[in-house]
Amino acid sequence: AKGGPTPSIAVLQDLDAEDTGFGCFWGEVQSNIHKGLGGVGVITDGGIRDIPDWADGFNALAGSIVPSHAHVHLAGFGQTVRIAGMVVKSGDIIHADQHGAVVVPEEAIAKIPAACDLLQRKEAVILDLAKAPGFTFEKLKEAIAKQDEIH
């Protein structure tokens, strides 16, 4: 958000225990407020609503989509939260996309490009064969063995 690290992602834990996602904090209003403050998205185990009316380009990963906001209130800010098993502290670096989210340890950031390159090269061995005519289980076993030679 403006005045803080950017881009920023709001991370909101729903504290309603067995009723998580019954109502929601996030909809048209919150998406516009947070985008206006420099935010790029929200991650919550709670519900979201009003999706067609959200701020353009504002992203969300949520536990559910619901029709109403119900009774919501903020219980704290800048605290450690737990979202679907992921523990997030204020200031953590998060990678998120349509598949989910993960906290990235600061010491791992510099290693990410090399790890992605290695993974891509290893997967290419199998993908190229799997997409080619005549792919068999035997060819898959050969590809897996070739993967082990890539470093």
Where are these regions (language model features)?
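Feature captures the catalytic cores and cofactor-binding loops of soluble hydro-lyases/lyases
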Residues: 1-90, 104-151
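Channel- or pocket-lining gating/hinge segments that regulate access to a cavity or pore
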Residues: 100-102
